[in-house]
């Protein structure tokens, strides 16, 4: 399971150190793709396979299904960690997520997300006030 928030940097070649706690869960290979909210989603191969199966079931006759699967799969790239525990973030994905030098890596249960430091701070700032309302609308059990 992926949990926590970590601050990292991306070098000029697009390499980023993956938090040590996440490396074992990621395995090799793993998949990185465009996520929602201008972040990147990083999935272990087993989780990617589950998601791929679900998305393949969407009706291709539906415009939204075609748009989403195109967006999601066209940005996907299979990756491996190097000996230093770094992953290479492809240039188109760095551009999509507005990744420059500083980034934030967060754990979200079955996936890892990579955010621009600025976008993450903005997202947290905007979401903090509405967290209780979101929880009330989505969760049917007491925390």
Curated annotation (Swiss-Prot):
Domain of life: Bacteria
GO molecular function: DNA-binding transcription factor activity; transcription cis-regulatory region binding
Compartment annotation: Cytoplasm, Nucleoid
Disulfide bonds: none
Domain SpoVT-AbrB: 5-47, 76-119
Keywords, in A-Z order: Cytoplasm, DNA-binding, Repeat, Transcription, Transcription regulation
GO terms under cellular component: cytoplasm; nucleoid
A Pfam family per the record: MraZ
One biological process term in Gene Ontology: negative regulation of DNA-templated transcription initiation
Main subcellular location of this protein, as a coarse class: cytoplasm
InterPro entries associated with the record: MraZ (IPR003444), MraZ_C (IPR035644), MraZ_dom (IPR020603), MraZ_N (IPR035642), MraZ_sf (IPR038619), SpoVT-AbrB_dom (IPR007159), SpoVT-AbrB_sf (IPR037914)
Family assignment from sequence similarity: Belongs to the MraZ family.
Known partners and oligomeric status: Forms oligomers.
NCBIfam families linked: division/cell wall cluster transcriptional repressor MraZ
Protein name: Transcriptional regulator MraZ
